[in-house]
Regions:
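A short glycine-threonine-serine/GTX helix/turn-capping micro-motif
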Residues: 56-58, 281-289, 397-399
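Conserved PLP-enzyme active-site core in the AAT-like
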Residues: 16, 21-25, 101-333, 351, ...
Length: 453
């Protein structure tokens, strides 16, 4: 882009911002108090809007009332570095108990020998693991972003920032999964330091047991990014990576595990030094303070997962399959029909003949149906991909079951395929969603999900 074009673009952005401010405060330049009040009003507006939306983003969920309560506690104002009993700050006497309990719950829920609950996000957890198990310029194998791999596994993401030399597994586009024979061949040829598995478009379990022989043969550390499926693993409805040859699991804690926006690392301790390396990778490596309020909310979520996790995971997968079937019966091109569409919370739909993923996602947003465009393996343009990604974990959390998936499919179809006016469909979306605004699969079940002062 030329210097003049860049200047014009920046000026347009500035003028647009001034226009929006002037529309909200037409009389004069707003005071700081007015701006703060505006933010509060906009936040209330967002809450009210989402209460009337069908949320289908595969990487989101809603907190339980108990988790939300501790997230909003004084812990938000406090700071901690290090581990319980070995802090660099005073004032953590009570929080030490909370963090220790959270780690204990994580190990119990996932049957793990080790847990670290300090990473502040999934990508921060990935950075910590990378620092723990790989040096810059060492080799790493992973799923390509175009095949559903996460951006943090790519050259432009966390793995690239760490300096890893990245090699992508051969991918079976029809089955939307790693090709196990191709993966074994790649691992034996490349001899990576790290074999990384896991995706952000994750329909089916990775064939870990077929691949682990090659991983062990070359002495690689086996790492599984479970961000999208952590709750399904906890609920015994996906796969069990720590029993299938994986050394380390990382993940965010706010997708199918319906906790706060945070991160977590789990491990088996078969490799010497792994525990201490991960601890150093987390602090001082990838974090300083680790968001005490989120650790407390995660502890509550894990306690709820022990009690409700299996039922929640089972219903989530059942809903995803039902939605895939309903959309397929309406004539939409849902991927992997021959495999039952999915074994996770996610389905993927090719909407290229209906204008592509970007157009469909924008039109659905106007109808209060919230999902995202997504690249499919045969796409080359991430801005205008041919697919959409749909996750049902939040609808499940709000009490929907298989019967409601038919109505969700019908509403999507009317906008995406029949090209009905989004404003017309929006009225039905709002009426439909009003019956599903309370949180389920948790303590204090039945309280509102989107209450805001």
């Amino acid at each position: 882009m030329s210097e003049n074009r860049t200047r014009e673009r920046n000026m347009f952005s500035f003028q647009s911002h001034r226009f929006l401010i002037s529309q909200r405060f037409p009389e004069s330049v707003p005071s700081s108090r007015e701006i703060a009040q505006s933010v509060r009003d906009l936040t209330r507006r967002h809450n009210a809007w989402f209460k009337d939306c069908i949320p289908l983003i595969a990487s989101e969920n809603v907190l339980s009332p108990a988790s939300r309560e501790v997230l909003n506690s004084d812990l938000h104002n406090r700071y901690a570095e290090g581990l319980p009993g070995k802090r660099y700050y005073q004032g953590n006497i009570v929080f030490d108990e909370i963090e220790s309990l959270c780690e204990k719950l994580a190990k119990e829920v996932f049957s793990a020998e080790f847990a670290d609950v300090r990473p502040t996000s999934g990508t921060v957890a990935n950075l910590a693991v990378l620092q723990a198990i790989a040096k810059p310029r060492e080799k790493l194998t992973a799923v390509a972003v175009s095949d559903g791999g996460h951006i943090s596994h790519a050259k432009i993401g966390a793995a690239g920032m760490r300096g890893a030399k990245i090699y992508n597994y051969p991918f079976n586009e029809k089955d939307m999964n790693i090709d196990p024979d191709g993966a074994k061949k790649l691992i034996r040829e490349v001899k990576p330091k790290v074999a990384l598995f896991g995706q952000s478009v994750y329909l089916f379990p990775t064939p870990l047991e077929e691949i682990k022989e090659a991983v062990e043969e070359v002495g690689a550390t086996a790492w599984y990014d479970a961000a999208h499926v952590l709750g399904l693993i906890a609920g015994k409805r996906f796969q069990d990576p720590l029993r299938q040859g994986m050394d380390v699991i990382s993940g965010s804690t706010h997708k199918t595990l319906p906790g706060p926006q945070h991160g977590m690392i789990l491990a088996n301790l078969r490799k010497e030094g792994l525990e201490s390396n991960i601890r150093r990778g987390v602090f001082p490596g990838a974090t300083s303070n680790h968001h005490l309020h989120a650790v407390a909310a995660l502890a509550v979520t894990l306690a709820e997962t022990k009690e409700f996790g299996e039922a929640y995971a089972s219903q989530t997968v059942g809903n995803a399959k039902a939605l895939g079937q309903a959309m397929h019966e309406l004539g939409m091109d849902v991927l992997c029909e021959h495999l039952g569409f999915t074994e996770s919370h996610t389905i993927v739909v090719d909407v290229q003949e209906h204008g592509g993923g970007k157009r469909v996602a924008l039109d659905l947003e106007k109808a209060n149906i919230i999902l995202n465009k997504n690249m499919l393996p045969w796409d080359s343009d991430p801005v205008r991909p041919s697919g959409i990604r749909i996750g049902v974990q939040e609808l499940t959390r709000l009490g929907m079951k298989e019967a409601q998936m038919s109505e969700v499919a019908r509403l999507i179809h009317r906008v995406a395929v029949k090209n009905e006016a989004p404003s017309k469909v929006k009225e039905e979306v709002v009426a439909f969603k009003r019956g599903y605004t309370k949180v389920h699969y948790c303590f204090f079940e039945g309280e509102e999900a989107s209450d805001y002062p």
